[in-house]
A protein has these predicted regions:
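Short beta->alpha junction loops
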Residues: 39, 63-73, 188-190
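Short beta-strand segments enriched in small/hydrophobic residues
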Residues: 31-39
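Glycine-rich phosphate/diphosphate-binding loop of Rossmann-like nucleotide-binding domains
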Residues: 40-52, 134-223, 227, 236-247
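Anion-binding alpha/beta catalytic cores of soluble intermediary-metabolism enzymes, centered on
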Residues: 93-154
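Short, well-structured alpha-helical segments in soluble
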Residues: 75-87
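Rossmann-fold NAD(P)-binding glycine/threonine-rich loop
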Residues: 104-121, 125, 228-280
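Short beta-strand elements in bilobed, periplasmic/extracellular small-molecule ligand-binding domains
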Residues: 33, 55-69, 183-185
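Positively charged, low-complexity intrinsically disordered leader regions
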Residues: 1-29
Length: 281
């Protein structure tokens, strides 16, 4: 059984990005990412801090907008507009979730698709579906890299994605399809979830329920990717998969922490470089 090491693989990607950034800088091309955070949600603050640290490591400038909780929709839209128009900014990231009084969809739609390094804009999603160049959502793209760099063959394999969110489940299915996997998407209305999961050569779980998937959902020799992240009753991080029960049955599995998590930020850095290469002045 192989433990897929997301820390190691994400570091490889960041080192590759760092080299690309140095090369672009040598050609006089700087890269900058605008990070917009509204309010001081503790989890969001940790993510923002990690993104800034990654930017610093690879040589991308990060421009921070830390806005108070009571920021209005108009004020937020004005900052997005300012970043859209600033030729020095290559990527715009709005840290989600936003406070309840703000319209997330309107804000994400307002981001210039050429700067949509999160890959959430409908234009980016459309490009992903038809296989055009553009930004891929960071977490699902990170999962594909984990599989490929761990020597897991996707082509022709039975792939099951548990969860159909716009951020992970749906794009995950699309990216596995692009790699010629035979993909099934499961959700709360799926009948016989256990039986469907047991068909999977590659099982990707993003269901948002701690330790939901145990060994009865997994066939011998499957590859299991756990996208979930929760804090359990002992104040320890755990995923959607009951790791201790499932791991012995698998041929490869991602742990939580140290699996999918670190990949998301590494792929964000990769998207910032893509932005400069595809659309930079």
């Amino acid at each position: 059984m192989q433990i897929i090491d997301g820390k190691k693989i994400s570091q490889e990607i960041k080192d590759e990005v760092k080299e690309e950034v140095a090369q672009l800088k040598a050609e006089g091309k700087d890269i900058a990412l605008a990070v917009i955070q509204v309010g001081a949600d503790p989890a969001s603050s940790v993510y923002v801090r990690n993104k800034k640290r990654a930017c610093e490591y690879v040589g991308i400038e990060s421009v921070s907008y830390e806005l108070p909780e009571e920021t209005t929709q108009e004020e937020l839209m004005a900052i997005v507009d300012k970043c859209n128009k600033d030729p020095k900014i290559n990527g715009i990231l709005v840290q989600l979730p936003l406070p309840k009084h703000l319209d997330e969809d309107e804000v994400l739609l307002a981001i210039d698709p050429k700067k949509d390094v999160d890959g959430f804009h409908p234009v980016s999603v459309g490009n992903m579906v038809i296989g055009e160049k553009g930004f891929l959502p960071c977490t699902p793209a990170g999962v594909i890299q984990l599989l490929k760099r761990s020597g897991v063959e996707i082509d022709g394999k039975e792939c099951v994605v548990v969860g159909r969110s716009n951020i992970v489940g749906k794009p995950m299915a699309m990216l596995l399809l692009r790699e010629n996997g035979t993909v099934t998407v499961c959700h709360s209305h799926t009948k016989d979830l256990k039986e469907v999961c047991k068909r999977a050569d590659i099982l990707v779980v993003a269901i948002g329920k701690p330790k939901f998937i145990d060994d009865s959902y997994v066939k011998d020799g499957a590859v299991v990717i756990d996208v979930g992240i929760h804090i359990n009753e002992n104040n320890k991080l755990c995923g959607d998969v009951d790791y201790d029960k499932v791991a012995p049955k698998t041929s490869a599995i991602t742990p939580v922490p140290g699996g999918v998590g670190p990949m998301t930020i590494a792929m964000l850095m990769k998207n910032c470089v893509e932005s400069k290469k595809l659309f930079g002045e």
